[in-house]
């Protein structure tokens, strides 16, 4: 079993020496270039991170001066130079505090909730107005169609009445010319009311 496993290892080693460890495709040719705005944000964040690191190193220096020499070497097994240990919880806490300021975050959520409520109420109100407008438009359209039909009927009745009056005038003028002229003079002499 040892011989077969050593042969298999030798075969694998030979196989890996033949293959190239570099990728067959250059991934940089498919990379999407980073916009300048994002690069600026990243550089600003890294500068603010450097500032916070300098504050932490200042704190470490103050702590180093405050602790006696024996206290600094208490945790190291060797008598070599003391290396400051990383406080993970403090680092995570500081990172979270920098990333999310709780007051600003709650204000943003509150503002977003209020804005969402206003948008929802206005969209509901707009939908109601659209529905009311559709109903009113159909009512006005129906009234207009009825009004145009009534106007056509009235126009036809006026034409019919005008024709009848002209026929009656012609008949009265020929049958009773004296009375017709007297009545006509009375009508023309009658004063017209301005109101």
From Swiss-Prot:
<dbReference type="GO" id="GO:0032880">
    <property type="term" value="P:regulation of protein localization"/>
</dbReference>
<keyword id="KW-0967">Endosome</keyword>
<dbReference type="InterPro" id="IPR019371">
    <property type="entry name" value="KxDL_dom"/>
</dbReference>
<dbReference type="GO" id="GO:0005768">
    <property type="term" value="C:endosome"/>
</dbReference>
<comment type="function">
    <text>Component of the biogenesis of lysosome-related organelles complex-1 (BLOC-1) involved in endosomal cargo sorting.</text>
</comment>
<keyword id="KW-0813">Transport</keyword>
<comment type="subunit">
    <text>Component of the biogenesis of lysosome-related organelles complex-1 (BLOC-1).</text>
</comment>
<dbReference type="GO" id="GO:0007032">
    <property type="term" value="P:endosome organization"/>
</dbReference>
<comment type="similarity">
    <text>Belongs to the KXD1 family.</text>
</comment>
<feature type="compositionally biased region" description="Polar residues">
    <location>
        <begin position="19"/>
        <end position="30"/>
    </location>
</feature>
<dbReference type="Pfam" id="PF10241">
    <property type="entry name" value="KxDL"/>
</dbReference>
<dbReference type="InterPro" id="IPR051390">
    <property type="entry name" value="BLOC-1_subunit_KXD1"/>
</dbReference>
<protein>
    <recommendedName>
        <fullName>Biogenesis of lysosome-related organelles complex 1 subunit KXD1</fullName>
    </recommendedName>
</protein>
<feature type="region of interest" description="Disordered">
    <location>
        <begin position="1"/>
        <end position="80"/>
    </location>
</feature>
<dbReference type="GO" id="GO:0031083">
    <property type="term" value="C:BLOC-1 complex"/>
</dbReference>
<feature type="compositionally biased region" description="Low complexity">
    <location>
        <begin position="44"/>
        <end position="56"/>
    </location>
</feature>
